[in-house]
From Swiss-Prot:
Organism expressing this protein natively: Mus musculus
Signal sequence, renumbered to the chain: 1-23
Disulfide bonds: none
Protein name: Secretoglobin family 1C member 1
Cross-referenced InterPro entries: Secretoglobin (IPR016126), Secretoglobin_1C-like (IPR043215), Secretoglobin_sf (IPR035960)
Alphabetized PANTHER family for the sequence: SECRETOGLOBIN FAMILY 1 MEMBER, SECRETOGLOBIN FAMILY 1C MEMBER 1-RELATED
Entry similarity comment: Belongs to the secretoglobin family.
Record-level GO cellular component terms: extracellular region
UniProt-listed SUPFAM superfamilies: Uteroglobin-like
Gene3D superfamilies with a match to the protein in the record: Secretoglobin (1.10.210.10)
Keywords, alphabetical: Secreted, Signal
Protein location: Secreted
Record's keyword annotation contains Secreted: yes
């Protein structure tokens, strides 16, 4: 639960700080951010979804710690999060 709460807090903070305005952009950014957080590296976060933003050292440190928490999840839990993400992405493509 701690990791989930931290993930939600960081993701919502990033959406607010980045100042994304359109709903489609919000969804696309959020889904790419989650996907990279689940299966990518911190560097891929900075080059991908956060690439156009100036991520300060404290935020990078927080993201590395969050990524570490996600990477330490039991494999079955991480697998279920990835499956959930795939469901959401598939549902978005259908609309």
């Amino acid at each position: 639960m701690k990791g989930s709460s931290a993930l939600l807090l960081v993701a919502l903070s990033l959406l607010c700080v980045c100042g994304l305005t359109r709903a489609e952009d919000d969804n696309e950014f959020f889904m790419e951010f989650l996907q990279t957080l689940l299966v990518g590296t911190p560097e891929e976060l900075y080059e991908g979804p956060l690439g156009k933003y100036n991520v300060n050292d404290m935020a990078k440190s927080a993201l590395r710690e969050l990524k570490s928490c996600i990477d330490e999840l039991q494999p079955v839990h991480k697998e279920q999060l990835v499956k959930l993400l795939v469901q959401v992405l598939d549902a978005q493509e259908d609309t």
